[in-house]
């Protein structure tokens, strides 16, 4: 079995978007949890274009004497996964842990992830126990998890939980991928030799509201479908072929019925004909929309614009020099 050297340094990557209320508690609890590891550590917080006071608070935390905080400030909002990738580009640790800023996944779980990674796993995922979310969020999450499992064949139970640990070579492999539509847990699993999940606690959100609106969840679902596989396009072709055959058979049936019962019968069936026609037209629009999603993502990738733009990185001078040496 492949073995890895012991983890000497842990990097915690946290995307932040309008989380000024939770930041003091987040910084305190994360630093306390990392201090118990008995290893070097750093806490990278990426401000994803916040409109509140988050950027200033992160900058002050990073500039404080003896701080383990690194503030990565993006010029605008790029989304959770792009912000995390921006953080990945500045980590210096052997093991990288991602964590949400809303404190629903307690930072106190970090030592358990490090302990599990020490057993030789490339990726350590988590499954939220007693999940404190709305019925809509739970249902959407279950549907997305099943879709991912069927498409990828990777039987992991909770892809939506961002409390995860990745070995350094997994991070380097993901940074070499340049597609704009990225879902980090899935991308990481494509490079992992050994992956495992552990149960973790899930708390109610104490500060602010969820940043995932209904439309953001829909967009995430499209990202998942289009970045995972081209199977929907194949299904679309099969579905179109079935519809064409049914339409041809239905047309023959109408001709036979007209010959058998006369033109009066055909007039009485006009509403059913329109109903079937609208069904076919609706199916065509669904197919065109799905095809448009793929073409739009190809267009974005061909333009080769960066996934994010880092406006400023604030860290302690000694860690800054180490990061420069690594790069």
UniProtKB/Swiss-Prot annotation:
GO molecular function: phosphotransferase activity, for other substituted phosphate groups; undecaprenyl-phosphate 4-deoxy-4-formamido-L-arabinose transferase activity
Location of the protein in the cell: Cell inner membrane
Annotated catalysed reactions: UDP-4-deoxy-4-formamido-beta-L-arabinose + di-trans,octa-cis-undecaprenyl phosphate = 4-deoxy-4-formamido-alpha-L-arabinopyranosyl di-trans,octa-cis-undecaprenyl phosphate + UDP
Membrane association type: Multi-pass membrane protein
EC number(s) recorded for this UniProt protein: 2.4.2.53
Name under which the protein is recorded: Undecaprenyl-phosphate 4-deoxy-4-formamido-L-arabinose transferase
Family according to the record: Belongs to the glycosyltransferase 2 family.
Listed transmembrane segments: 236-256, 270-290
Organism of this sequence: Klebsiella pneumoniae (strain 342)
Listed Gene3D superfamilies: Spore Coat Polysaccharide Biosynthesis Protein SpsA, Chain A
Coiled coil: none
Matches recorded under HAMAP family: ArnC_transfer
GO process terms (BP): 4-amino-4-deoxy-alpha-L-arabinopyranosyl undecaprenyl phosphate biosynthetic process; lipid A biosynthetic process; lipopolysaccharide biosynthetic process; response to antibiotic
Keywords, alphabetical: Antibiotic resistance, Cell inner membrane, Cell membrane, Glycosyltransferase, Lipid A biosynthesis, Lipid biosynthesis, Lipid metabolism, Lipopolysaccharide biosynthesis, Membrane, Transferase, Transmembrane, Transmembrane helix
Pathway connected to this protein: Glycolipid biosynthesis; 4-amino-4-deoxy-alpha-L-arabinose undecaprenyl phosphate biosynthesis; 4-amino-4-deoxy-alpha-L-arabinose undecaprenyl phosphate from UDP-4-deoxy-4-formamido-beta-L-arabinose and undecaprenyl phosphate: step 1/2; Bacterial outer membrane biogenesis; lipopolysaccharide biosynthesis
UniProt xrefs under SUPFAM superfamilies: Nucleotide-diphospho-sugar transferases
